Amino acid sequence: MRPISATIKEIIDETPTIKTFRLDVDDWLHGKPGQYVMVWIRGVDEVPMTLSYDNAITVQKVGEATEALFKLKAGDSVGIRGPYGNGWEIVGDDILLISGGVGSAPLAPLGEKARRIGVNVTTLAGYRTKEEVHFEDRYRAAGELVVATDDGTYGKKGYVTDLLKSVDLKKFTQIYCCGPEKMMYRVLCALDEAGVAGLSQFSLQRYIKCGIGVCGSCCMDPDGLRVCRDGPVFDGETLLRSEMGKYARDASGRRQQI
C-alpha cells in the first residue's frame, strides 16, 4: 500500500512532550482500537504510530522522526499507510486497563468503545509527573480511574504497577496493558503470579519497517511472530515465552537489552 497524503488539521498539546495530531484524509481510517498506521515524515523516516482517535495520532517526542513531526504545523502534511495490525479484542463485561505514559494512545479509545457497548471499565494510569497527565477526561468518561505519578505530584505516589495491589485482578474478564516495555513486563509478571496472564492482552512496540509482515524486521523470538501483522497486541501467555522484557532488535537486527 502506498502512503496517502494526510493534512494536519489540528495539533493539540496534551503535555510538554506529547501532542495529538488530528488528520484530514480523503476517507476515514476506520481503525479499531489498538491498530496503528505507518506515518511518513517526508525527508526523515516512516514510523508506526497508534491511532488514538479515528483520524488522529498521539505522539511523544522521543527520537528523530517524532522531533521532526513536532516541528510541523497545522496545514502541513504527512504520508499515511494503514491501518495495520490486529488491535484489541473486548472480552467479557468487566475489564481493566493498565496504562503507562503514552500507552494511553491505544487504551483510551478501547475504554470508550467498551463503555459504548455496556462493558464496565476500570483504568489504572501511571505518569511521571502531574504535567504529563493526559486523557484523564477520556478515562473518567469510560469508567473508574485511579492515577499514580512517580513523584506524587498528582494522584497516588508510585508506579502504575504499585496500583495493582489495590485491585482484585481475578475479578476482571480481561486485562489490557500498554506502556514502556519494562513496565509492561512487570505487569505481566504480576498477572502471571496471580494466575491471570491468560486473561490479558498487551500492545508491544518493536522496530517496524514494512507493516505488512514481509520484511521480518519485527519478528519476535522464539516463535517468529510478526509484531506488525500478528500483533501489535498479544496475549499474556504468548509473551511469557517470548523475548518481551529481555531484548528487542534495532534497525540492523542487532539485539538491544530492554
From Swiss-Prot:
InterPro entries: Cyt_c3_hydrogenase_gsu (IPR012165), Dihydroorotate_DH_ele_sf (IPR037117), Dihydroorotate_DH_Fe-S-bd (IPR019480), Dihydroorotate_DHASE_ETsu (IPR023455), FAD-bd_FR_type (IPR017927), FNR_nucleotide-bd (IPR039261), OxRdtase_FAD/NAD-bd (IPR001433), PyrK_electron_transfer (IPR050353)
GO molecular function: 2 iron, 2 sulfur cluster binding; electron transfer activity; flavin adenine dinucleotide binding; metal ion binding; oxidoreductase activity
Pathway: Pyrimidine metabolism; UMP biosynthesis via de novo pathway; orotate from (S)-dihydroorotate (NAD(+) route): step 1/1
Cofactors required: [2Fe-2S] cluster; FAD
Keyword Flavoprotein appears in the UniProt entry: yes
Binding sites annotated in the UniProt record for [2Fe-2S] cluster: C210, C215, C218, C228
The protein's assembly and partners: Heterotetramer of 2 PyrK and 2 PyrD type B subunits.
NCBIfam families membership: PRK00054.1-1 (NF000796)
Stated role: Responsible for channeling the electrons from the oxidation of dihydroorotate from the FMN redox center in the PyrD type B subunit to the ultimate electron acceptor NAD(+).
UniProt record similarity statement: Belongs to the PyrK family.
Protein's UniProt name: Probable dihydroorotate dehydrogenase B (NAD(+)), electron transfer subunit
Organism: Methanocella arvoryzae (strain DSM 22066 / NBRC 105507 / MRE50)
Gene for this chain: pyrK
